[in-house]
Design a protein with these regions (language model features):
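Active-site neighborhood of phospho(di)ester-bond hydrolases with catalytic His/Asp-centered motifs
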Residues: 1, 9-12, 90, 109-112, ...
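Catalytic core of the metallo-beta-lactamase
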Residues: 51, 56-121, 126-134
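Divalent-metal (often Zn2+) His-rich catalytic cores of metallo-beta-lactamase-fold enzymes
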Residues: 118, 134-239, 302, 306-309
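Alpha-helical segment of the N-proximal tetratricopeptide repeat
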Residues: 252-285
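Feature captures hydrophobic
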Residues: 269, 278-284, 291, 295, ...
């Protein structure tokens, strides 16, 4: 790639969105992804079966090669190694930045992840920006209009192809209608006053979709997707002031246990619900007790049993994995996930300076820098001649801000450092002090300004509790 012999082609905005998902929210999203995909579950009928969209995810470090060519418009055509490719931009569909592409000389249409042999997520349970179901359906329809008449084979990112024009068109039409149906029916009920949980409880997939395997909820789930549609238009809040500022789980758990007359009463009620097969109610009861007292082994064990039953009954692999991961962690504790900073390096090296500073900003411990301010000029000699060579990084009102292409003559300090070396520091391969003393970093002015910023950066939790406090 660096030698120019290979292009990395991506939709406009791809790198920005990758950074947002994998770095700014990376630690939290990565921890939650263990629940969505279940890679730490033992394989087998009582453990991990698959991920719904594919068999499994790898547990190695993440890497990223930045795109060398952005696609910016539908109808844009490139010839890659002698093969013509026509692109369709599909932003805010399965991902914020996405595209389909067509090989006109072969009649082959790739729908990326906009179509799969399963219902997809409108928002993954690991967390992400909520997807636009309406726009998603419209872009599938646009693909039918643009490419449908000339498509002889259709394939997607994860699953097997569809052969023949008629089969491909039928597949696209049903996928289009699935996302539009979820969107329209959710909002129909929302506009009658139903809240997200009520809508999820009442909507059922009609036979039109149940008759075909590729519109079943093996990955995404109607329960979760209807809530995603509601969230996109109406937020997490259901409009009831009782839910506007609810107590956190530990506080509400203790109050429910007290109201019930103690842990034994909660456990007794939970067992009755469990034996009756009322697993969702049983899980809610035991959740209050586990958060009120995570040392209560009887409560943890019963909640694990409940989660397992909920998992075994789930068609969606992500629901199953989440329930079974919760059960496993209630019995054995959550895993040691140390080394996260190093695993992020593969993505950091592809980031712009602005994106690097944005990732630093979300680590600033605001409570520690009250009343402090700082201005630091940055020069990156390995980016000489580019718009990223000079930067200003400032601390103001417990917040970091950055400005490209500017130095401030009143800055507290000016630092010259290679971008690659800054990444080494951020991933804890070395320190500012060591590199300054060895002459690899030069700093003029008040070096404590640098310490004011970088000495008050938080370290993201390598792992954190989910099913307990």
């Amino acid at each position: 790639v660096d030698a120019g012999r290979c292009q990395v082609i991506a939709p406009e905005g791809f790198l920005h969105e990758v950074v947002g998902e994998n770095i700014i929210a990376g630690p939290a999203m990565g921890r939650r992804a263990l629940y969505q995909f279940g890679p730490l579950l033992p394989p087998g009928p009582r453990g991990h079966v698959d991920c719904g969209l594919g068999n499994a995810i790898p547990m190695g470090p993440n890497t990223l090669i930045a795109p060398t060519r952005d696609i910016t418009r539908t109808g844009e055509e490139l010839t890659v190694d002698g093969v013509r490719v026509v692109f369709q931009m599909t932003p805010e569909t399965e991902a914020p930045a996405e595209m389909n592409f067509f090989f006109p000389d072969f009649g082959a249409l790739c729908m990326a992840e906009n179509c799969s042999h399963t219902m997809h997520n409108l928002i993954p349970i690991r967390g992400a920006l909520v997807r636009n179901a309406l726009r998603w359906s419209k872009y599938i329809n646009e693909a039918i209009e643009i490419f449908g008449a000339n498509t002889n084979v259709l394939f997607t990112s994860h699953n097997w192809p569809r052969w023949g024009r008629d089969d491909a068109r039928n597949f696209l039409e049903l996928q289009r209608d699935l996302y539009k149906w979820m969107h329209d029916q959710t909002m129909r009920l929302a506009n009658k006053g139903y809240v997200a949980t009520e809508i999820a409880e009442s909507l059922k997939l009609p036979d039109d979709f149940l008759a075909q395997e590729h519109t079943h909820g093996y990955y995404g789930d109607l329960i979760h997707n209807s809530k995603a549609v509601y969230q996109r238009y109406l937020s997490w809040y259901d409009g009831n002031p009782a839910n506007l500022n609810k107590l956190p789980p530990v506080d509400v758990g203790r109050k429910y246990v007290e109201l019930a007359g103690g842990p034994a009463k909660i456990i007794s009620a939970g067992r009755v619900a469990f034996e009756a097969g009322d697993y969702r109610w049983a899980a809610e009861l035991m959740n209050h007790l586990v958060f009120a007292d995570p040392t209560n082994q009887e409560a943890r064990s019963l909640q694990a049993d409940i989660f397992e039953q909920l998992g075994y009954q789930s068609e969606s692999s992500t629901f199953r994995n989440a329930y079974l991961m919760g059960a496993q962690e209630l019995r054995h504790g959550y895993p040691d996930l140390s080394g996260g900073a190093g695993r992020a390096r593969g993505i950091l090296v592809a980031m712009t300076v602005e994106q690097i500073f944005d990732t630093i900003s979300v680590r600033l411990k605001g409570e520690e820098v009250g009343g402090l301010s700082a201005l630091v000029n940055w020069t990156f000699p390995d980016l000489h001649g580019t718009q990223d060579e000079h930067w200003l990084l400032g601390l103001s009102h417990r917040t970091l801000f950055s400005v490209r292409g500017r130095h401030d003559q009143n800055a507290n300090a000016s630092i010259t450092v290679k971008r690659a070396l800054l990444i080494d520091i951020l991933t804890q391969q070395t320190t500012f002090a060591d590199q300054i003393s060895s002459g690899n970093i030069s700093i003029e002015g008040d070096a404590t300004a640098l310490l004011t910023i970088f000495g008050n950066l938080d370290v993201a939790a390598a792992g954190f509790a989910i099913v307990e406090p």
